[in-house]
Amino acid sequence: MDRPDEGPPAKTRRLSSSESPQRDPPPPPPPPPLLRLPLPPPQQRPRLQEETEAAQVLADMRGVGLGPALPPPPPYVILEEGGVRAYFTLGAECPGWDSTIESGYGEAPPPTESLEALPTPEVSGGSLEIDFEVVQPSSFGGEGALETCSAVGWGPQRLIDPKSKEEAIIIVEDEDEDEQESMRSSRRRRRRRRRKQRKVKRESRQRNAERMESILQALEDIQLDLEAVNIKAGKAFLRLKRKFIQMRRPFLERRDLIIQHIPGFWVKAFLNHPRIPILINRRDEDIFRYLTNLQVQDLRHISMGYKMKLYFQTNPYFTNMVIVKEFQRNRSGRLVSHSTPIRWHRGQEPQARRHGNQDASHSFFSWFSNHSLPEADRIAEIIKNDLWVNPLRYYLRERGSRIKRKKQEMKKRKTRGRCEVVIMEDAPDYYAVEDIFSEISDIDETIHDIKISDFMETTDYFETTDNEITDINENICDSESPDHDEVRNETTDNNESADDNETTDNNESADDNNENPEDNNKNADDNKENPDNNKHTYGNNFFNGGFWGSHGNNQDSSDSDNEADEASDDEDNDGNEGDNEGSDDDGNEGDNEGSDDDDRDIEYYEKVIEDPFDRDQDDYEDVIEIISDESVEEEEGIVEGIEQDEDVYQEEGNYEGEGNEDVWEEGEDSDDSDLEDVLQVPNGWANPGKRGKTG
């Protein structure tokens, strides 16, 4: 059915038979020849991925759509050489199209006009993707247009081929500039990153340097404050030292008097010391038998040194009654020794006897006269700080070693005879404990902060060095040792003199005290032979009142020393007290005592040492009990580590039980009024003579 808007159908012209039909149109002209373009260098040729992307773009422009890159619709000619691919398409009715051209194997002369019309940069550019489309001229109405794409941009250009009047469209895409731009941007980023890292490192170094500088500044400030405290502590110690020297002087004088009545005391003390006997030969032993006293004194000025004095009786070796060896510090701080020349009798010089005795060079008096030995300072320090402080423990060491050898022989005899031996006396028990404490003295380490020898002056020069001061607790341990607790006599008040001491014998023999000191030399042998007479052993006014009373005084002063030192343990004495104080070495002490700060600093010390003998007796008794309890625990711990026979252990248990009961019974009988005159020190090892017997 015809539509209403359409007109009548047009009449077609009929051809008569007389009219001949028109001739076939002429054959189409041959297709334009292939364009030969110069290939880019190899380094600028596109890669496979770029080639695929360019083909995809061309396909989109032709309207093929997304998907893999496809060639243009046929008929087309593909020219591919050196990584460059060109598509040539012609219209289906284009004149001059040839099957050889369609298949891509035809050859024709290149159109020079088209090549000349193209600009050189677009023809010989870098990585190119070229698409040629050739259509019929009638479809575009005459002239064709040429459009190119380059790095500059899209711009239409008209290329008129006067012969074929065909239109060619060339699309050029270049990606080299993008790659170079990306490389340049990556280099810029790396440079910025390196600059930032260098800047961070430089800032961190600056911060660390500033932090270290602030730390060092704080440390320097603390050190300055510490030096100021050390100066004050040195001044306080100086005053405290003078007080203690005055307190100890009577005890030292009393000790010297007692030692003079003991023949061969110093030679035994020297020989029993673990380090000094290397300098003593047999000839020195004979000379030391005439030694009556040994004194160690500090020099007058602060930090100048000290000297040792040896007092001798008349002897056949030399004429000196006193020989002195002095150690003085020079400007460099080194100790330089000087000694008095020894006036030897004819033929007694060590040099004259050197040919006959090879050990003459290892002599105490050779060391005394020689000032170039490297070990001279060390030996002098041992004598000053160890031997002279407590010579009694080294004097009693030989007895302990002899009893130890007897015990070993007794053990061998027991194992040989295979019989049980019952010890009837308690002397081995006493000597065992004595030997323990003698061994402890070998391993005692001297504390180099405070030395007792600095407080044990015998001269009137009280200015001292504060480079080394021994811990005063060492003296307390010495006074609490079993050698000192051998006698359980109750001493009178310290204000009474040694000759007026009235002692009460805890062994029930107050009337049996001997007034002759020579009879007391037999007490040790009587103790071994007659165990029943142990209660009459140590009853002598001389040793009990003078010697042991002095140890009681030493104990009192040691307690006060301990209390005073506990308050100043943390103080640091550098040994440069005199230099920091700015005091002159002329013996004047005004610089040390004139400031009010010093009085405030040592207020505690003066309160402690104002009158140590007038303190409350109840408080003093508590201190004594605490010290004695600690000493008992220490002794018990040491005794447990020694290998002894089972019988000896059994005896120790029996003795300890009975001895403690007797001591505490006596403590209960004493009244408060008696505490002023008598101080009980409960110690299970104090008096082995009061212990029971085993049998």
From Swiss-Prot:
It holds the Pfam family NAP. One of its GO terms (biological process) is negative regulation of cell growth. The keyword RNA-binding does not apply. It is found in: Nucleus; Cytoplasm. Residues 1-56, 175-207, 471-603, 632-695 are annotated as: Disordered. Residues 481-491, 519-535 have a biased composition (Basic and acidic residues). InterPro entries: NAP-like_sf, NAP_family. Induction: By TGFB1 and all-trans retinoic acid in lung cells (at protein level). Keywords: Cell cycle, Chromatin regulator, Cytoplasm, Isopeptide bond, Nucleus, Phosphoprotein, Transcription, Transcription regulation, Ubl conjugation. The modification Phosphothreonine is found at T340. This is Testis-specific Y-encoded-like protein 2. Residues 496-518, 558-601, 632-677 have a biased composition (Acidic residues). Residues 185-202 have a biased composition (Basic residues). Ubiquitously expressed, with highest levels in testis, adrenal gland, cerebral cortex, ovary, skeletal muscle and spleen. Present in testis, adrenal gland, cerebral cortex and ovary (at protein level). The modification Phosphoserine is found at S18, S20, S670, S673. Interacts with histones. Interacts with CASK. Part of a complex containing CASK, TBR1 and TSPYL2. SUPFAM superfamilies: NAP-like. GO terms for cellular component: cytoplasm; nucleolus; nucleus. Synaptic activity down-regulates TSPYL2 protein levels by inducing rapid proteasomal degradation. Residues 23-44 have a biased composition (Pro residues).
